Structures are given as structure tokens and as C-alpha cells.
Regions:
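N-terminal FAD cofactor-binding segment of flavoenzymes
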Residues: 26, 36-82
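C-terminal helical "tail/cap" subdomain of flavin- and related membrane-associated enzymes
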Residues: 331-432
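N-terminal Rossmann-like FAD-binding beta1-loop-alpha1 element of flavoenzymes
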Residues: 3-32
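Conserved Rossmann-like nucleotide-cofactor binding loop
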Residues: 15, 38, 164
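Short beta-strand to alpha-helix junction loop
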Residues: 95-115, 245-251
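Redox-cofactor binding/interface segments in oxidoreductases and associated redox assembly factors
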Residues: 10, 159, 300
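FAD/FMN-dependent oxidoreductases across multiple families
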Residues: 218-222, 231, 244-325, 335, ...
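Predominantly flavin-linked oxidoreductase catalytic cores and closely associated redox partners
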Residues: 116-265
């Protein structure tokens, strides 16, 4: 007879760990299955952790989790080939106030979180691939793994196995991910002495800086670049839609190398030692690409469900929140003695709709399509903004009114009046 659990969680990333932790802590018999050698083994890169989402699951997590730096400064750069126009926000952590965001090293963070999951009572088995879901009368009743005698039964299965979610796709629970809905991000870890990092970014102690980059660095493809400060390293990377990489014939590695040579980026990395490289798929199709998230005996959360806010570059908080809402739905049904059927699990979808997750994704639901069909936001406008800034700031004896007329003429020449008005309307609608 196959072994039976109350719940099986497929995946040991942020969403899977949250779900497994809460279910096990509530007394359920939980099995967590992970493909990697250990949780986090496939994620060597740095990332952003949103403390509020984690603290709703593990109070006082800031004192326990292996955080790198608290982010006190956010920089956003709109770039052409040689310059950028940007905006900065820098705050301070007042006495008694807790930081909201931290940089982390996923390999370290995931291992810590996995230990908390096991301490809560869940059984973790690594280096195990779920090859398919077991079904009976159209209901999911467990999983089959690649191990000998790998059939395992459960009352409920939580799918948190990443962006491709091969298990859900193979079992017909969701369609295959489309190339226009997923981005490929490549990242490097550049190691520097702590003192040099703090000097270059004007920070001290455990304070950190995040830089997000848009514009010509993606060579007309929909995507962004980024740079995060860790304690003794800098995470730097760039990501674009898979469909764009295929169409343009550009190597992600070359795109990253070109970005690192940009005059604004190169000095920040000078003298560093590259020790780690990784590539990662990110679901960026937004609200319109989210599949069915529940069914007979199963729910899906995290990247598996496409829960990423690409406009605000948020992922880990959505992953943890969806994992929490999935677990809370399961526990509520269990307490009420109700079955994990599709009708009852609809509560999970309702909880998602009531949360910031779906509200934010719905707000920006048109943004992926707008960027896909309006590449001028990534090419023409960065050039125009840079040229306008240079014209205004240059002191050359030309009066400011003439400079303003020259700038307006440049904008109209590149986009036309109708084009400028149309682009403005598109952006307003996308952010409404």
C-alpha cells in the first residue's frame, strides 16, 4: 500500500516552504518533495525578501533569517547607451522601526527556511522528482515520484514547483507556459570587501541599495536590469522575455556583459571577483496569464501559478502570500470537516482576489501587452529623456526657452504629436 499523508507539497521555494510550514505547524502530516540536492541548491543568486510577508508566517523572522542588507535606497535608471536619467529614494530606519525589504542569498535563505519547516514537523525528501499526479475519478489523490515504489497518496497536493510547473502541465491542470509570458534572467555574484561596497554605495552597517535599470540596455526587448548590494557581494543581472531573446537572436550572457560595460554600471563592479552565475525563468505574463489555481484535491501557488508583479519587480512576497493563503484555506476546510474538492477550494481563489496579490496584478494586467506592442518605451524615450536632460543641464549661452523648444521639437520629430498623446494615454491606462 502506498504511504499516505495529509498533504504533499511539491517544491521547497518560498511558496512551498510557507505552505508546508503552516500545515505542519497545525498538526498535519506533511510530505515536502524537492528536486534539488537541498532547498536552495538551484538558487545561488541574490534576491529581495519582503519582511512583512515572511513575518506574517514567522514572527521575529528578522532576528532569525539570514538576511544580507536592509534596503534603505532605491534607484531607478532609464538608460541609453552612455547615460541615464534616474530617480532615487533614500530613507532611514528610525528607532523602533523595522526595515521592510532585505537582500538575501537564496541558497542560504532557503536552507534556513527549510530547517524551520522540518522543525514544524514536515518530512522533507530532496533529490526527488514528481513525475506525475495520481488521479482517481478526476481527483488528485497523490503523486508518483522517480524513486522506486514512488507512489504516495495524500488528501491534498500543493503545487509549488516553479515557473514551468511540469507536474501541473503534464497532468493537464494548466497549459504550458508561453514564451511571451516568461522572462529569462541571468545573474552574477560579484565579490568585493565589505568596506568597498559600503564606500561605493554610500552606505554603512547593514544598510543596502537596489538599482533597477530600464531602456536601451535590453536592446529593444521587454526586460530590466538590476543590481543588489549584499554584505560582501553584489548581485547583478538582466532579464528579458524568452520570446524576445528568440526573435532577436541575442545571447542573455552577451546582454549581461554589455550592461556591465555601461559607464554607470562598470565603476560599481570594478575590481570584483565573479564566483557565481545563474539563470532563472520568471513568470511575467501577469494577471491574464494566471491559470486555474485550484481543483479536485489540489492547489497551486508561487511561480507555478504565475504570481509575479513584473511592474514593481515583486515575486517573493507574492510567493509567500499565495503559499500562506493556500495553507489557510486547507486548514479552514480541515477544521470544518469539509472535503478538498474544487467547490470548497474556491475559497483559495477568493482569498487571492481579496488580497493585494490579485488586486495589484489586476491593476497592471495590460502592461505586458502594452510593452510588447510599444517598444518605443524601451528605445526611443530613453534616448529622448537623456538628450533632454543633457540639453537642459548644459550651460552654453543658449536661453532656456530656446532649449525647451528644441526639446519639444525633438520629441515631436521622433514620435509625432499623435504618437506622444497616444503613448501617454497608453501609460495612463496601464497604471490606472
Amino acid at each position: 500500500m502506498p504511504e499516505t499523508f495529509d498533504a504533499i507539497v511539491v517544491g521547497a521555494g518560498p511558496s512551498g516552504n510557507v505552505a508546508a510550514y503552516l500545515l505542519a505547524k497545525a498538526g498535519m502530516k506533511v510530505l515536502q518533495l524537492e528536486r534539488g540536492e537541498y532547498p536552495g541548491s538551484k538558487n545561488v543568486q541574490g534576491a529581495i525578501m519582503y519582511a512583512e510577508a515572511l513575518e506574517s508566517v514567522i514572527p521575529n523572522c528578522r532576528r532569525q533569517a539570514p538576511m544580507e542588507r536592509a534596503i534603505i535606497e532605491q534607484r531607478m535608471w532609464v538608460m541609453d547607451e552612455r547615460s541615464y536619467v534616474g530617480s532615487h529614494y533614500r530613507g532611514t530606519i528610525d528607532t523602533g522601526e523595522q526595515p521592510n525589504r532585505y537582500t538575501i542569498i537564496r541558497a542560504n535563505f532557503d536552507k534556513w527556511f527549510s530547517r524551520k519547516v522540518r522543525e514544524a514537523g514536515a518530512l522533507l525528501i530532496c533529490e526527488t522528482t514528481v513525475v506525475e499526479l495520481l488521479k482517481k475519478d478526476q481527483r488528485v489523490i497523490g503523486v508518483r515520484t522517480d524513486r522506486e515504489g514512488g507512489e504516495i497518496h495524500a488528501d491534498i497536493v500543493v503545487l509549488a514547483d516553479g515557473v514551468n510547473s511540469l507536474v501541473a502541465t503534464k497532468s493537464g491542470l494548466r497549459p504550458p507556459v508561453k514564451a511571451q509570458d516568461v522572462a529569462l534572467a541571468v545573474k552574477e555574484m560579484h565579490f568585493l570587501p565589505r568596506e568597498q561596497i559600503e564606500q561605493r554605495f554610500n552606505i554603512s552597517g547593514d544598510d543596502g541599495v537596489v538599482i533597477e535599470m530600464f531602456g536601451k540596455i535590453t536592446k529593444g526587448m521587454v526586460g530590466t536590469g538590476f543590481l543588489y548590494t549584499n554584505k560582501e557581494s553584489i548581485s547583478v543581472g538582466i532579464g528579458c522575455m524568452v520570446e524576445d531573446f528568440k526573435r532577436a537572436g541575442i545571447s542573455p550572457n552577451q546582454l549581461l556583459e554589455d550592461m556591465k560595460k555601461h559607464p554607470a554600471v562598470q565603476p560599481l563592479l570594478a575590481g570584483s571577483e565573479i564566483k557565481e552565475y545563474s539563470a532563472h525563468l520568471i513568470p511575467e505574463g501577469g494577471y491574464n496569464a494566471i491559470p486555474t489555481v485550484h481543483g479536485e484535491g489540489w492547489v497551486i501557488c508561487g511561480d507555478s501559478g504565475g504570481f509575479v508583479n513584473s511592474v514593481h519587480r515583486e515575486g517573493s512576497n507574492l510567493a509567500m502570500t499565495t503559499g500562506r493563503l493556500a495553507a489557510e484555506t486547507i486548514l479552514a476546510l480541515r477544521a470544518e470537516g469539509k472535503d478538498y474538492n474544487a467547490a470548497n477550494l474556491r475559497r483559495y481563489r477568493s482569498a487571492l482576489e481579496d488580497s493585494f496579490v490579485m488586486k495589484d496584478l489586476k491593476k497592471y494586467r495590460d502592461m505586458p501587452e502594452i510593452l510588447h506592442h510599444n517598444r518605443q518605451f524601451l528605445t526611443t524615450y530613453p534616448e529622448l529623456l537623456s538628450s533632454a536632460a543633457q540639453t537642459l543641464l548644459k550651460v552654453d549661452g543658449i536661453d532656456k526657452r530656446t532649449k525647451e523648444k528644441d526639446i519639444k521639437r525633438d520629441f515631436v520629430a521622433r514620435r509625432s504629436r499623435f504618437g506622444l498623446v497616444g503613448d501617454a494615454i497608453k501609460l495612463v491606462r496601464a497604471f490606472r
